[in-house]
């Protein structure tokens, strides 16, 4: 670290504020209320869930799609600021083997906030899934210094659900 870094701070020491937008329209639900311990006990990270309305899951940030599960019920992505996100539709939806889900985006694709990643049939999923609560979690929480969770009704791609400092 040089003299100017000590006086003015280096880029590496500056925190970055990141807003994570709703990936699905609906009502925010506490992550602790998701009926799956993997999410409610924050085993895979901290975040929020949404009780969905509508028929699409969108990119919650500008970034790159990582892995999209073969069954299209979940995906990971990384924001341009390096925040790693995991989006999962419903609980035990993997057991539906892709029924009710249509992949729109592809792994490795650069996306903008609001771009459609997956489309879904909500009526079918409500009738067949254990729950349609849709969690989004930060999987690299060790790099996050502060997380503020929003509440209320949200619109996909338009409403902030999490405000972070990285």
UniProtKB/Swiss-Prot annotation:
One of its GO terms (biological process) is phosphoenolpyruvate-dependent sugar phosphotransferase system. The keyword Cytoplasm applies. Binds 1 zinc ion per glycerol kinase EIIA-Glc dimer. The zinc ion is important for dimerization. It is found in: Cytoplasm. The EIIA domain is phosphorylated by phospho-HPr on a histidyl residue. Then, it transfers the phosphoryl group to the EIIB domain. Zn(2+) binds at residues 73, 88. Residues 36-140 form the PTS EIIA type-1 domain. PROSITE patterns: PTS_EIIA_TYPE_1, PTS_EIIA_TYPE_1_HIS. Disulfide bonds: none annotated. It comes from Haemophilus influenzae (strain ATCC 51907 / DSM 11121 / KW20 / Rd). The active site is at 88 (tele-phosphohistidine intermediate). Keywords: Cytoplasm, Kinase, Metal-binding, Phosphoprotein, Phosphotransferase system, Sugar transport, Transferase, Transport, Zinc. The phosphoenolpyruvate-dependent sugar phosphotransferase system (sugar PTS), a major carbohydrate active transport system, catalyzes the phosphorylation of incoming sugar substrates concomitantly with their translocation across the cell membrane. The enzyme II complex composed of PtsG and Crr is involved in glucose transport. This is PTS system glucose-specific EIIA component. GO terms for molecular function: kinase activity; metal ion binding. The record marks 73 as: Important for phospho-donor activity. Its cofactor is Zn(2+).
